[in-house]
């Protein structure tokens, strides 16, 4: 949703004609840029997360705690991106879907945002346990699977509870056009604090602590697996920092009511960093599923089953993959305690 909508009048109402002209230019830019980005994220997120869900449910037996998380993560991201077409339309025109849909979509949007971030945190902690406490983790897989399902249920419940302010106070109001949001300073402060804590600082802290120990552990290991795992760790950290840090920093600056907030350039920064932050819903399937050898193998099974292999010209690759299945099976026990089950 367009974060700037709730505040767009605050920074411009008292400005001169020149500033009003800049404001109109900004509105024109936002009407094109944000809806286009929303639709790109929607299409890519819909395809990527749907693939992960289909493969996880129909082609992959849940064998580890990470598998449980990797069913819930694309589900949360998938529902999240399905709200974006509504915000895209509202960005171009105005909110026409009524108050009930406003509260519903705000709730869905927020619940799945928190769920996605909390599951990312759990995946990070699980990887820490798998790598650093490999033997113990392998011996307690059955118990961890049960706990994983309980944890995922708790995550959805917690996400619902912390989303209640948006659901209760979300409303349709008029700021030059009809907008769906919440226009209460206290509620905005509570929402910001919750989003920053659960949606940024908690997963960031988990990544810093857990991945630091994981890297130290892997550096004492050897072979190809170590180097591959280290590359993926740095990629995960880089993507999270590059996509989430700018937007959260902008939200912090906006909450201080610093004078720079009233400048037109800051409003451009808000919507650009927001669009970048939403890219996580497209990148999560790549970072947390497609890096897995097992997942890629099941992906080609899906492609074969729907009859696309001849058209893609990959029948040779599929045959090669089938020939290597014994090698894959032989290495399964090693993968069970590896960094990303690669």
From Swiss-Prot:
GO MF annotations in UniProt: C-C chemokine binding; C-C chemokine receptor activity; C-X-C chemokine receptor activity; coreceptor activity
Chief location category: membrane
Intracellular or extracellular location(s): Cell membrane
Pfam families: 7tm_1
GO cellular component: external side of plasma membrane
Residues bearing glycans: 16
Keywords: Cell membrane, Disulfide bond, G-protein coupled receptor, Glycoprotein, Membrane, Receptor, Transducer, Transmembrane, Transmembrane helix
InterPro entries in UniProt: CCR1-9-like (IPR050119), Chemokine_CXCR6 (IPR002235), Chemokine_rcpt (IPR000355), GPCR_Rhodpsn (IPR000276), GPCR_Rhodpsn_7TM (IPR017452)
Domain of life: Eukaryota
Family stated for the protein in its record: Belongs to the G-protein coupled receptor 1 family.
Function according to Swiss-Prot or TrEMBL: Receptor for the C-X-C chemokine CXCL16. Used as a coreceptor by SIVs and by strains of HIV-2 and m-tropic HIV-1.
Protein name, as recorded: C-X-C chemokine receptor type 6
